């Protein structure tokens, strides 16, 4: 059904998986997409919608984002990989090895930061539920979001300021951004990858 427009809508792979990667990338960079250029491919002739998508984004703070999502990458098991490159170095994280973050400073050696290890940010410490060396698991990632949202709701009901570390949960605007990105990516792919505005009207 994911590739049937009558059931899935205008996009398959990008709408199913790509928007989650886009949201994570926006959160990590602290920037929102401004424009995008999309290349959609259907590797099976029977599929109307895309099963492989490569989308480039121009972000609000000047960053460049390259997003690839595919359901035909044989041998990759939910291979979510995030890489960030900046003037001070590069970061790399892979979902298949979720407890390690690789940091390579410019002209330096690669360091491995372990989840739950010393010297991490308060946000990272707060999100760790089990001791170092034990897998957190995907459900706990969602539990962190629900716990943060519950803290904000309770704080509002009780008339107090919520814990500032709990204010990083996805909002309705993030959902709107995902829907706008799907429409823009479909339009861009249909125009041979033409750069297309990826902002919701409220951010234009």
Language-model features and meaning:
Residues 1-47, 101, 192:
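Predominantly a Rossmann-like dinucleotide-binding segment in NAD(P)-dependent oxidoreductases
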Residues 19, 45, 68-76, 137:
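Glycine-rich phosphate/pyrophosphate-binding beta-alpha loops
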Residues 2, 54-61, 88-169, 204:
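C-terminal glycine/acidic-rich active-site capping loop/insertion
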Residues 187-204:
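C-terminal capping/lid region of NAD(P)-dependent oxidoreductase domains
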Residues 21-22, 145-150, 182:
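A general structural signal for well-ordered alpha-helical segments in protein cores
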Residues 31-32, 47-49, 63, 76-80:
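Glycine/proline-rich active-site loop of Rossmann-fold NAD(P)-dependent oxidoreductases
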